[in-house]
Design a protein with these regions (language model features):
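C-terminal auxiliary extensions adjacent to catalytic cores
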Residues: 1-120
């Protein structure tokens, strides 16, 4: 349940970061000019959003893998590959434990592009 709260909090922060920075304007030179680039701020927000999204996806992938382990139906080929990839890095939950390091591990792998190996 805590993983769900974390994902919800991250998603809320993503909503805040999605507001356009180009709508902000800072007049300079005694209001004669208003050319203040917000490009750097926009780029920072995009980078931060990418990191937050990788954390949300990591939480979702781990929870989905746990669910797959507990159902009798067999998932499709693509889902099997994703499940196998997650299980290479995160052990099944056999008892109560902190998910922080597991979520951080998968998040980092997503940011580094390691997931692209799933469908090669």
């Amino acid at each position: 349940m805590i993983v769900h709260y974390v994902a919800a909090a991250l998603t809320s922060e993503l909503h805040l970061l999605s507001n356009s920075t180009t709508t902000y304007n800072v007049p300079v030179s005694l209001d004669k000019e208003d050319h203040v680039s917000m490009g750097a701020t926009g780029a920072y927000r995009a980078l931060k959003s990418t990191k937050l999204l990788s954390q949300v996806l990591a939480n979702e992938l781990i929870c989905a893998s746990e669910a797959i382990d507990r159902i009798s139906e067999s998932p499709g080929d693509g889902v099997k590959k994703i499940h196998s990839w997650v299980r290479n890095f995160v052990n099944p939950m056999n008892s109560d434990r902190s998910m922080t390091s597991d979520c951080e591990k998968i998040s980092t792998l997503l940011i580094d592009g390691e997931h692209s190996s799933i469908f090669r």
